[in-house]
Amino acid sequence: FAIHTARKRLLGIENIKPFVVQNLGKYERQVWQAAEFGDNAEPVLRAYRGFMLDLYHADILEGYVWLHGVKAGRMVHVGTVDSPVVRADVTHMIAEFRRAIGAGSAARVKGIDVLGWDFALDMQETVKQEAAAAGVDVKFIRIPREVLEKKAVDQGDIRFFELAALAVEVRGVKRDVTVELSDFMVPRDDVPQDVIHAVKHWADWIDYWAIDFNYRDDTFHNEWQSYRTRRDRALQLSVTHAYHEPGDYTVVIKVIDILGNDTTKAVPVKVR
């Protein structure tokens, strides 16, 4: 939250020069894991997963590689601290899920809860749909940074939120491309009731959003953004960008909601 607030304040400075927000979370998590559970690879991984499953109120499941726990009739996968959850991971989970059905503790599972620190692009839309087509209900759930804080863990102040779903309309006229947010759906199971009651329109969930109009599978470049401030609560929901050259581009939209979670969506664009 502090980093997000600092970014908005920097953007509010007139004639501010370009800057980069470096995400060092992976290294921080690696240090935390070593401090909490030690350096011996396999025991550390088991202890880490057990810790996460306990926070998630899930039971440990033995005998599987990609499925680590069971909660309320659903399997649970715990992502590692240093790698995002990607499509191939989900493919392995589904294959193991099918082999596990009808065996022991996994006899009545309904789907898979995938806990992760980071997720590859379009997991909530594309990969979730692919899993559904394969007959498996998959939920992607972000591991909150608060698990790194002993005080928050001891007080039980840990909330796991499912990834939101972002709907975007992209329209092109020659070299002008308009990107418009059309919906933002936040799963409400674990959202505080006072927050839910305060939201009157889907856009109320959004605090900040930005666009990289030419994403090249590397770093997200903040080429345009709209965000709320204390004085100005208005949020622009569409923008038009003019490309200098025709070609195939990937537009990436990043949204940060009022809960502090980020959602990213990639859209292919053909400019004539």
Predicted regions: what is each one?
Residues F1-R272:
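S-adenosyl-L-methionine-dependent nucleic acid methyltransferase catalytic domains
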